[in-house]
């Protein structure tokens, strides 16, 4: 998911995406440990997606705090 697509989401949608991505990452790591994972690069892409989601969420938190001051 691109940063532009993430910025179009609402804050609650971003939080939901973070939650589902973390679950996916957990499952991928479990598959890797048991030797069932064939597409190991998927772990990297999910981690980067989580980072993008968290970055946009934090940007919004900062904007809200600036608006309240």
Swiss-Prot record:
Superkingdom in the source lineage: Bacteria
Keyword Ribosomal protein tagged: yes
A Gene Ontology cellular-component term: cytosolic large ribosomal subunit
One example GO MF annotation: structural constituent of ribosome
TM region positions: none
Family: Belongs to the universal ribosomal protein uL29 family.
Official protein name in the record: Large ribosomal subunit protein uL29
Lineage: Bacteria, Bacillati, Bacillota, Bacilli, Bacillales
